């Protein structure tokens, strides 16, 4: 997320990359407030960047407050503007969103999903919030503030398994079903499916979409 934080360093790095003419393709993660520059995005594309992952996390202000995300990175209009600029520069936009945040209910989760649809990134990733041991959030859960842990097995601590249950959910299956619902709601929109079909430019694109479609069917339908 910090690659583009220092603008001077980033511009110098990109200039060197372009001058070296290495013809490399690369991706990165970035915070919204660090790429608020059209020229920087264009230079990133010229140097070979084809994809940026933004961690938007949620579309609900109170949930963002609960996990103390940077206010500069959760302004909806700014998210929308930077996403538009990134696409205009010829760079794909991938966005990450969380379900099962502290203070969340199914109704609030659906607001986050709606935010994802309105922001309309090229690809969206929805994962279950996983409070790792030793973090502030994990400590608060241990104190009974937001919900309860349902496992302490470190093998389960990843973004795909439910390790804790917020008070707003009845059980882990309800939370996991919300994650599945998010993927279906985002990816099965007719407008989205049509746009991806029209974006096909090569056989590699077809193979990539088939692979992604299989993963969607297997994991979330």
Question: Which sequence ranges carry the predicted segments?
Answer:
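A structural motif corresponding to the C-terminal lobe/cap of the Radical SAM core domain
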Residues: 4-7, 12-204
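Short linear elements at protein peripheries
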Residues: 208-221
């Amino acid at each position: 997320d910090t690659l583009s934080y220092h603008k001077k360093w980033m511009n110098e790095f990109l200039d060197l990359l372009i001058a070296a003419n290495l013809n490399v393709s690369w991706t990165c993660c970035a915070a919204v407030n660090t790429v608020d520059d059209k020229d920087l995005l264009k230079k990133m594309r010229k140097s070979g960047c084809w994809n940026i992952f933004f961690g938007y996390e949620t579309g609900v202000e109170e949930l963002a407050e609960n996990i103390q995300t940077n206010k500069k990175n959760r302004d909806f209009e700014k998210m929308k503007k930077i996403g538009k600029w990134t696409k205009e520069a010829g760079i794909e936009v991938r966005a990450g969103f969380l379900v099962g945040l502290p203070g969340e209910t199914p109704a609030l989760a659906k607001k986050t999903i709606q935010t994802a649809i309105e922001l309309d990134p090229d690809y969206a990733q929805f994962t279950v919030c996983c409070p790792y041991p030793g973090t502030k959030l994990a400590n608060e859960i241990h104190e009974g503030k937001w919900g309860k842990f349902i496992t302490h097995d470190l093998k389960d601590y990843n973004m795909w398994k439910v390790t804790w249950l917020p008070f707003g959910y009845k059980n882990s299956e309800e939370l996991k079903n919300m994650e599945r619902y998010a993927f279906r709601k985002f990816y099965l929109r007719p407008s989205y499916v049509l746009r991806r079909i029209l974006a096909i430019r090569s056989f590699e694109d077809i193979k990539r979409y088939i692979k992604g479609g299989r993963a969607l069917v297997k994991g979330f339908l």
